[in-house]
Amino acid sequence: MNFLHSTLDRLREFTPVSNTSTFRTNGQITPEEFVAAGDYLVFKFPTWSWADASPTSKRASYLPAGKQFLVTRGVPCHRRLDDDFAGEAGHDETVVGDGEDFRGTGHSPGDDEDGWLRTGGLAASQEARARDVRTVDESGEMGEREDDEDDIPDMEDEDDDDEAIIRDPKADNANSSRRTYTIYIAYTPYYRTPRLYLSGYLSSSQPLPPHLMMEDIVGDYKDKTVTLEDFPYFSNNIKMASIHPCKHASVMKTLLDRADAALKLRREKQKQGKTVPGAKDTGMEGLVDDFEKTKISDKKAMLEGLKAGGNGNDEWEVLQHDQDFASEEEEVAIRVDQYLVVFLKFMASVTPGIEHDFTMGV
């Protein structure tokens, strides 16, 4: 299966390039829009940078020299994912289908092969409340919370003296679970979307064997959505884990539509005076956070900061137009030059152990 994907992808690289923008209609972007989105990402998050093909004969003619792909290095990954991984703290899994509510439930990874798995469900605060079992006395007063069995010290735990245990430092280093990744973003002319490539390193800075990179991929994606591929801009045929772009455009279109709907709802509430200054919205409305910006073509200034809306648990940041940039009727939540910011948040659902937000710190 991996060989078939690789062969087809090499043939698809010869697809004629389209320069017609269809970003708002189907989530696809042109090479020019990819460069604009890359410029925004590099300006906003300096851990990212543009890079050139090596050798130059590997350059794609539809992209400028020196801006063939984007790269960030040293991204930490502290844990491995097994096949039963379902998000932190045993969170449920949901599948995001084309045009479907990102918060929808009732699916499992195998129900919809065309969907994308979103890990996580039950919030930590909800889990804590489920454990918070208390008694009520005859007068109706609530008693103190009873200790969980896991909270009661075990006498056997007190027997071992940590200072008396002789540890082998070499063994600790060899078994260290910490890895780092170099992340690449390239453009695919066939799917007209970005494509993510991952190259891993052990804690000792030694290259991570390609098959071990799959330990950091959510189980349902292994060999199906994520395959091992040669990076097209290098001549030494370095195998990398690559997230196949066949569904990127449709999922991005879903996110664009939902963000626009949330922004429209927020504007209506503002007109009716239903919003409270400083209050935090929940759900998709909480993703919309206004901020000032200029056009990406204006080289004098771009952005001072990326502000996240929502209830503190939201992963997505929805960006909007300055009033001077477009009329209210044309206002959208996510512009094309902000595409890669949302794209990386989307990609994080495939590799939740890799700290993608590390690359997006201000």
Curated annotation (Swiss-Prot):
This protein's name: Autophagy-related protein 3
Keywords, alphabetical: Autophagy, Cytoplasm, Protein transport, Transport, Ubl conjugation pathway
Record's keyword annotation contains Transport: yes
GO molecular function, one term: Atg8-family conjugating enzyme activity
Region (Flexible region): 84-168
Domain notes for this protein: The N-terminal region is involved in phosphatidylethanolamine-binding and is required for atg8-PE conjugation.
Places the protein is found: Cytoplasm
General function of this protein: E2 conjugating enzyme required for the cytoplasm to vacuole transport (Cvt) and autophagy. Required for selective autophagic degradation of the nucleus (nucleophagy) as well as for mitophagy which contributes to regulate mitochondrial quantity and quality by eliminating the mitochondria to a basal level to fulfill cellular energy requirements and preventing excess ROS production. Responsible for the E2-like covalent binding of phosphatidylethanolamine to the C-terminal Gly of atg8.
Biased composition (Basic and acidic residues): 85-104, 128-137
Taxonomic lineage from the root: Eukaryota, Fungi, Dikarya, Ascomycota, Pezizomycotina
Chain positions covered by the region annotation Handle region: 250-338
GO biological process: autophagosome assembly; autophagy of mitochondrion; glycophagy; nucleophagy; protein transport
Region feature Disordered, mapped onto this chain: 85-164
Entry similarity comment: Belongs to the ATG3 family.
Species this chain originates from: Sclerotinia sclerotiorum (strain ATCC 18683 / 1980 / Ss-1)
